[in-house]
Amino acid sequence: MDQFECINVEEAHQKLHQGTAVLVDIRDPQSYAMGHTPQAFHLTNDTLGAFMRDHDFDTVVMVMCYHGNSSKGAAQYLLQQGYDAVYSIDGGFDAWHRHFPSEVAFGA
């Protein structure tokens, strides 16, 4: 994959529950604490190194932000770091929360 692709929350949900991809949430700590996908890794400048140590470049990565805009830049960055397959989730956490309100965790 030379460029990231955009996927909707239904596709992301399917990949996550099939175990074929990991989900990273790039929102600020306060927004993340107020609600996030339970399986999400909170990816920040401080946690990037740990994420890269724990996930090989052949790991399929899905990036979630607030509305699906900031995730595009982060997805491109992860591709530039060497990840083979990266997706930006259209609609971000707002769309996830609308479609899957029972699949939201709270706290850090």
UniProtKB/Swiss-Prot annotation:
The active site is at C65 (cysteine persulfide intermediate). One of its GO terms (molecular function) is thiosulfate-cyanide sulfurtransferase activity. Its EC number is 2.8.1.1. It is an enzyme of class 2 (transferase). InterPro entries: GlpE_sulfurtransferase, Rhodanese-like_dom, Rhodanese-like_dom_sf, Thiosulf_sulfurTrfase. Belongs to the GlpE family. This is Thiosulfate sulfurtransferase GlpE. The lineage of its organism: Bacteria, Pseudomonadati, Pseudomonadota, Gammaproteobacteria, Enterobacterales.
